[in-house]
């Protein structure tokens, strides 16, 4: 059997189907809640996808927001991604010492769980003249492991 060497030969039908299903569910939820259609942000977690799949999602299917959950994975494929019109969000646990590696690559960080991490993000973002949106994790249930 001949090995596939280009994205032209590779089928991404599963991505078309999955995205259509997710968008339909989002539209139904918007309708049920009374929100205007298209006002909900679709953030595609791409942790197990390869760069061809991600580029297909963003450049062919129009997904504009992708979420990475590992610093090393983000760094290893960052240059191969077609980032035209795409915002990358960091959605995984982030150690303070790794902020410097992603601060110029992400639109937001969704996992800020300590003041020291927030301060490091602020310091690194200011150094390059950027503002980074952050989402703060709050342990409202006083659970010890959160």
Identify the role of each PLM range:
Residues 1-146:
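Conserved alpha/beta-domain cores
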């Amino acid at each position: 059997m001949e090995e596939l060497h280009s994205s032209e030969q590779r089928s991404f039908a599963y991505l078309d189907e999955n995205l259509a299903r997710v968008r339909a569910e989002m539209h139904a939820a918007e309708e049920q809640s009374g929100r205007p259609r298209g006002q909900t942000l679709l953030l595609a977690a791409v942790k197990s996808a390869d760069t061809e799949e991600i580029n297909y999602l963003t450049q062919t299917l129009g997904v504009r927001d992708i979420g990475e959950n590992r610093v090393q994975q983000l760094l290893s494929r960052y240059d191969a991604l077609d980032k035209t019109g795409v915002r990358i969000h960091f959605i995984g646990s982030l150690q303070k010492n790794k902020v410097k590696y992603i601060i110029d690559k992400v639109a937001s960080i969704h996992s800020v769980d300590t003041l020291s991490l927030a301060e490091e993000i602020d310091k690194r973002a200011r150094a390059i003249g950027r503002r980074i949106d952050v989402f703060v994790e709050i342990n409202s249930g006083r659970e010890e492991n959160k």
